[in-house]
């Protein structure tokens, strides 16, 4: 799938392992993995950061193969899931930082243009998440209140 606002084609990606069973050398039980996920979520880490930590320091390549469910599902089951989906949150964070930059540098036309692109991506993602009921139907992105969503 191509990029939305650039020329890149986005071809390269990592290949998922063929075996869906946990490796034989992995001695951690699924309950231990769930406890670790909850512990990291309480520290304030995002689901992707939790996955990176589990992969790098605990040797768990795919949480789904060990526990049978994905990180976000485990977080939802324990009531620790973020209220705004992670990709939307990071786009809002980017828009807030560009807006802050534009307050200091009013003549930066390129940043103004990039802000328009980022905000259009935010609106598109929000529409998708409302359709799939991951966001409430009355949720709306407003640039004035965006900094409170990120903080």
Curated annotation (Swiss-Prot):
Record-linked SUPFAM superfamilies: S15/NS1 RNA-binding domain
Cysteines engaged in disulfide bonds, as pairs: none
Cited CDD domains: Ribosomal_S15p_S13e
UniProt entry keywords in alphabetical sequence: Ribonucleoprotein, Ribosomal protein
Molecular function GO terms recorded: small ribosomal subunit rRNA binding; structural constituent of ribosome
Biological process annotations from GO: translation
Protein's UniProt keywords contain Transferase: no
Highest rank taxon of the organism: Eukaryota
Keyword Ribosomal protein among record annotations: yes
Pfam family, one: Ribosomal_S13_N
Gene Ontology CC terms: cytosolic small ribosomal subunit; nucleolus
PANTHER family, sorted: RIBOSOMAL PROTEIN S15P/S13E, SMALL RIBOSOMAL SUBUNIT PROTEIN US15Y-RELATED
Family: Belongs to the universal ribosomal protein uS15 family.
Protein name from the UniProt record: Small ribosomal subunit protein uS15
Name of the gene encoding the protein in the UniProt record: RPS13
């Amino acid at each position: 799938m191509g990029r939305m606002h650039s020329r890149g084609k986005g071809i390269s990606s990592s290949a998922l392992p063929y075996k869906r069973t946990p490796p034989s050398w992995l001695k951690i039980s699924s309950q231990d993995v769930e406890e670790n996920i909850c512990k990291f979520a309480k520290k304030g880490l995002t689901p992707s950061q939790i996955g990176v930590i589990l992969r790098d320091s605990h040797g768990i390549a795919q949480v789904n193969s060990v526990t049978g469910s994905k990180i976000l599902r485990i977080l939802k089951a324990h009531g620790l899931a973020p209220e705004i989906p992670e990709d939307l949150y990071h786009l809002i964070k980017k828009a807030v930082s560009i807006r802050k930059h534009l307050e200091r540098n009013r003549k930066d036309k390129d940043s103004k243009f990039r802000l328009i692109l980022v905000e259009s991506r935010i609106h598109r993602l929000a529409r998708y998440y409302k359709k799939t009921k991951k966001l409430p139907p009355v949720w709306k992105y407003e640039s004035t209140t965006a900094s409170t969503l990120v903080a």
